């Protein structure tokens, strides 16, 4: 069982994928104590399988990040920014709201995310008791053979736990990781392209 998000002492989220031609992704609500899957739902991850003879290569993109307050499970997909909000209070995945990109998995498969020269990447997710924070970075790339990924700007998108968009904060630094500390009420950010040279602290 591949646990990707621990919700509380009894619940966790895991992911699974099929590679049999259907090539689908699933999120699962799991009872930690027994390992039993309580409920599952299709995800919007893109699973690509390439077979050459007896060899098989697998590429999984647009995977979600997770945050939960114990009652709601929020997902944000890395390349599309789609936000899904599930009510998990009854031990099931009850979708209560989706925000943003509405493309189907089949439509997303037509997008070559690796060849995007410029766009937005929803790279990090954190939360407080009052809101969910998504770090969105604007990026550009230079093509091979001298491939380079550069972060151009960073902003913080906030939502309440019901899925209602709140404020957008434009950060004065380019960062690609964020973590909210509930004890201090501060947001700690850094850019690993700079090899952890600086940590930037924001008050919200």
Regions found by a protein language model. Name each.
Residues 1, 35-59, 91-117, 172-173:
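Surface-exposed loop and turn segments in beta-propeller and other repeat-based domains
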């Amino acid at each position: 069982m591949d646990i990707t998000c621990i919700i509380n002492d009894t619940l966790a989220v895991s992911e699974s994928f099929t590679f049999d031609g259907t090539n689908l992704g699933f999120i699962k609500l799991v009872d930690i104590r027994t390992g039993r899957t309580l409920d599952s739902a299709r995800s919007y991850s893109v699973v690509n399988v390439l077979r050459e003879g007896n060899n098989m290569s697998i590429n999984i993109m647009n995977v979600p990040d997770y945050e939960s307050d114990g009652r709601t499970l929020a997902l944000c997909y890395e390349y599309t920014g789609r936000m899904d909000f599930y009510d998990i209070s009854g031990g099931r995945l009850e979708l209560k709201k989706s925000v943003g990109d509405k493309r189907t998995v089949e439509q997303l498969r037509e997008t070559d995310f690796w060849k995007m020269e410029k766009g937005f990447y929803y790279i990090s997710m954190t939360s407080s008791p009052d809101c969910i924070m998504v770090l969105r970075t604007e990026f550009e790339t230079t093509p091979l053979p001298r491939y380079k990924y550069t972060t151009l700007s960073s902003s913080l998108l906030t939502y309440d736990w019901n899925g209602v968009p709140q404020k957008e904060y434009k950060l004065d630094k380019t960062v690609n990781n964020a973590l909210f500390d509930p004890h201090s009420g501060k947001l700690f950010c850094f850019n690993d392209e700079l090899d952890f040279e600086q940590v930037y602290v924001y008050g919200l």
